[in-house]
Amino acid sequence: MANLKDIKLKIKSVSNTEKTTKAMKLVSNVKLKKAKDFAKQSKAYAIKINELLSEISAKIQVNIKSFADDKFFDTNREVKIVDIIFVTADKGLCGGFNIHTIKKVKETIEEYKSKKIKVRLRAIGKKGIEYFNFQGVELLKKYIGLSSSPSSKKAAEVIYEAINDFENGKTDKIVLIHNGYKNMISQEMKVNVLLPVEPPTANENSYVGSNMEFEPSDGGDNIIRTLTKKYFEYSMYYSLIDSLAAEHSARMNAMENATNNAKERLSQLNLEYNKARQSSITTELIEIISGAESMK
């Protein structure tokens, strides 16, 4: 049985760990609430832009050559190269958050490679960058600091770098992958095709399938550019905020589990300490009694 001094050192170490994980859980909880509120505010706007753009893009399919930006909506474009933008955290200690994202990225890479399609990676987040660097996988772009501190300006820069390559024929498709917030105890992996824009199927309840008429004019191209610009910006920015909320949720749960494990370990160590102390006292009493008996 371990001696009392060793057990006391273990108790102190585990106790300090418990305090640290408990504090990290509280910090993550506060950050999660802020990220959730921010994401909620941005999501409604992003969804409305997406819906409007998709409705118009469906109408454009009928007369796609009328628009200067028709390549954004050309879903029949031959795909030879795909750019994958993926978001991981800059920090660890968040359970399987980063692992799940990396796994989905690898699966997506293999899916395209099986179709003889070249894949280029644009990595956001230190953990994803470190992993693929270690694996010897080439990364076209690397962004550190953006996933932990989302910026709409920086998000726009990231997405427009990819869009420029799309317009210049360097890539034929842009896919965005991130681990999003679902609820307090789970996350949801999201894989979205940003380009080309996928229009919905027209039906009697949609603007496209009913009375919506979209006639090209001198300002038509500007309308499309403005909508697509906002759509891409907010899709990128929202994915960063959504990922951050999911990260804080995962870290909060990981720290809660770590705290519970530390408490359980402390209970075991205290029991072990009490047993060792009792054994030590018993041994001392036996020695005293034996000594007294020998003196008779």
From Swiss-Prot:
PROSITE patterns: ATPASE_GAMMA. It is found in: Cell inner membrane. One of its GO terms (biological process) is proton motive force-driven plasma membrane ATP synthesis. The keyword Signal does not apply. It is a peripheral membrane protein. Its main location: membrane. One of its GO terms (cellular component) is proton-transporting ATP synthase complex. Keywords: ATP synthesis, Cell inner membrane, Cell membrane, CF(1), Hydrogen ion transport, Ion transport, Membrane, Transport. HAMAP family: ATP_synth_gamma_bact (MF_00815). F-type ATPases have 2 components, CF(1) - the catalytic core - and CF(0) - the membrane proton channel. CF(1) has five subunits: alpha(3), beta(3), gamma(1), delta(1), epsilon(1). CF(0) has three main subunits: a, b and c. This is ATP synthase gamma chain. The lineage of its organism: Bacteria, Pseudomonadati, Campylobacterota, Epsilonproteobacteria, Campylobacterales. The gene is atpG.
